[in-house]
Amino acid sequence: LIRRPLLSWLAPSRIFDQIFGEHLQESELLPASPSFSPFLMRSPILRMPSWL
């Protein structure tokens, strides 16, 4: 399993761990990368529209 993808400079490795099948809590993702949080939050109030 690749632990450090080529795009690791775009996001924390923890986000890639989730993509590769390791389940993470949202509370672990959001503080790790504030700039990505609007795209990762799954709250119905803050969810990005499906067409974006």
From Swiss-Prot:
Signal peptide: none annotated. Coiled coil: none annotated. Keywords: Eye lens protein. One of its GO terms (molecular function) is protein homodimerization activity. The keyword Nucleus does not apply. The keyword Secreted does not apply. May contribute to the transparency and refractive index of the lens. Homodimer. Aggregates with homologous proteins, including alpha-A-crystallin and the small heat shock protein HSPB1, to form large heteromeric complexes. Belongs to the small heat shock protein (HSP20) family. This is Alpha-crystallin B chain. It comes from Columba livia (Rock dove).
